[in-house]
C-alpha cells in the first residue's frame, strides 16, 4: 500500500502549488517565484518519509521509530532519519522551483490531451487513495498539480534531450552508454528441478551433475566454442538428469535466449546474479544459480545482442541516460534561488504524523 499510494508523489519529486485540506498555515513560503501551499509541503514531506522507510532495515518500524533511526543514504552518508526527511523535503521543493523556472523560461504549455490525462489520473488516484491522502493533508488540487508537474517534466525533458531538442542524444552516445552500463549476453538455462513431475525426486547428486554440465559448457565457450553450437547437447543432457522429456525445437527455443538488462532492472534478478555479473568481463562466460535453474551466461556488448531500434522501442533511453542528471540540475537550480521558506510554518507539520496506510 505504501509504495503504491506514493507513486504519484515520488515521480514528481512531490510538489504542488495549490490544494490542501489543512488551512493553518496556508503556505510555507517560497523558493524563487514558486510559492508552496501547505498541501505542497505535506506532499513533499510525505514523499520524503516514503524514501526514508525504504532505507530502514526494520520493515515493521513505524514512521516515528524510523525518524529516530540512523540510515545510510544511497550516497553512503549516514544520518538520523529525521534529518534525512528534512533534507529530502527541501530537495523536493527545490526541484519543483527549478522545474517551474525552466518551464517558464521555455514557455512550455501542456496540450489539451495532457490536461485531459491529468484529469483522468487525478480522478482515479483520488478514488483509490483519496482517504489516505486526506489524512496527510493532501487534497485533490495537490494531486492534480503533482500530475501536472510530472507531465510538464516529460515535455521539458523532450525539449532538451529529445530527437528535436536542444541537446539531442546521438545514437553513438546511446550505444556507448548501453555497452558501459547495461548487462547483456547470451543465456542457456538449465533446470535443477523437474517442474513437469513434482513426484520425481531430483537428488543432490543430480543437481551436482547439472552443475557439472553447466560448468563444462561455460568452459567450452570460454575456450572459443559457440554457445549455440553446444546448447542443444548440454540442455538435452540436463533434462535427462532431472527426468524431463526433451524436445529439441521447443525446449531449446525456450531456454536459449539473449538479454539486455538495464541497471535499474538488475535487482529483479537477485543479489547472486548481480554480484556474479558485476565482475564478469565482456567476452567471458560464467555459471550463475537462479532459483531452480542454472544460467550459463556469456556476457557480450549490448549493441551486439540487440539492435538500438529494438531497445528504444522498449526503453526511454534518453531518460535512462540523462534523467537523473537532469532532475539534479533542476534541483540545484532551485537550491540556488532565493529561499523564503518559513521554518516556523513548516514546523507546524510534523513528519511523525505522516500516515503510510489507511
PLM features per residue range, with description:
Residues 45-48, 52, 93, 97-110, ...:
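Sec/Tat-exported extracytoplasmic proteins
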Residues 133-209, 215, 266-358:
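PPIase-associated folding chaperone regions across multiple families
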Residues 22-138:
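N-terminal targeting/tethering segments
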Residues 216-270:
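Peptidyl-prolyl cis-trans isomerase
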Residues 41, 115-118, 143, 174, ...:
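Hydrophobic/aromatic residues in well-formed alpha-helices
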Residues 1-10:
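Positively charged n-region of N-terminal signal peptides that target proteins for export
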Residues 22-23, 32-39, 216, 230-235, ...:
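Cross-family detector of peptidyl-prolyl cis-trans isomerase
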Residues 15-19:
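C-terminal motif of bacterial Sec signal peptides marking the signal peptidase cleavage site
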Amino acid at each position: 500500500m505504501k509504495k503504491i499510494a506514493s507513486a504519484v508523489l515520488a515521480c514528481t519529486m512531490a510538489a504542488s502549488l495549490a490544494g490542501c485540506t489543512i488551512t493553518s498555515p496556508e503556505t510555507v513560503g517560497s523558493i524563487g517565484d514558486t510559492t508552496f501551499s501547505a498541501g505542497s509541503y505535506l506532499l513533499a514531506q510525505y514523499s520524503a518519509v516514503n524514501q526514508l522507510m525504504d532505507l530502514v532495515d526494520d520493515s515493521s518500524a513505524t514512521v516515528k521509530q524510523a525518524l529516530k533511526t540512523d540510515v545510510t543514504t544511497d550516497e553512503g552518508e549516514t544520518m538520523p532519519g529525521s534529518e534525512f526527511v528534512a533534507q529530502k523535503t527541501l530537495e523536493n521543493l527545490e526541484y519543483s522551483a527549478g522545474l517551474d523556472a525552466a518551464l517558464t523560461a521555455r514557455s512550455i504549455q501542456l496540450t489539451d490531451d495532457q490536461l485531459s490525462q491529468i484529469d483522468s489520473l487525478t480522478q482515479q488516484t483520488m478514488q483509490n487513495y483519496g482517504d489516505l491522502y486526506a489524512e496527510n493533508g493532501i487534497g485533490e488540487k495537490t494531486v492534480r498539480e503533482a500530475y501536472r508537474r510530472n507531465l510538464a517534466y516529460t515535455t521539458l525533458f523532450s525539449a532538451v534531450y529529445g530527437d528535436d531538442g536542444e541537446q539531442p542524444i546521438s545514437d553513438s552516445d546511446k550505444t556507448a552508454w548501453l555497452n558501459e552500463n547495461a548487462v547483456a549476453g547470451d543465456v542457456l538455462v538449465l533446470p535443477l528441478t523437474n517442474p513437469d513431475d513434482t513426484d520425481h525426486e531430483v537428488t543432490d547428486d543430480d543437481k551436482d551433475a547439472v552443475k557439472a554440465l553447466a560448468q563444462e559448457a561455460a568452459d567450452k565457450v570460454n575456450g572459443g566454442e559457440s554457445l549455440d553450437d553446444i546448447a542443444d547437447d548440454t540442455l538435452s543432457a540436463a533434462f535427462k538428469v532431472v527426468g524431463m522429456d526433451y524436445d529439441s525445437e521447443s525446449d531449446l527455443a525456450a531456454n536459449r535466449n539473449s538479454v539486455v538488462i538495464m541497471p535499474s532492472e538488475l535487482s529483479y534478478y537477485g543479489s547472486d546474479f548481480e554480484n556474479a555479473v558485476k565482475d564478469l568481463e565482456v567476452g567471458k562466460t560464467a555459471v550463475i544459480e537462479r532459483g531452480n535453474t542454472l544460467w550459463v551466461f556469456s556476457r557480450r556488448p549490448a549493441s551486439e545482442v540487440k539492435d538500438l531500434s529494438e531497445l528504444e522501442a522498449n526503453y526511454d533511453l534518453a531518460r535512462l541516460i540523462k534523467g537523473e542528471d537532469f532532475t539534479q540540475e533542476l534541483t540545484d537550480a532551485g537550491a540556488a534561488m532565493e529561499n523564503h521558506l518559513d521554518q516556523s510554518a513548516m514546523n507546524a507539520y510534523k513528519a511523525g504524523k505522516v500516515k503510510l496506510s489507511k
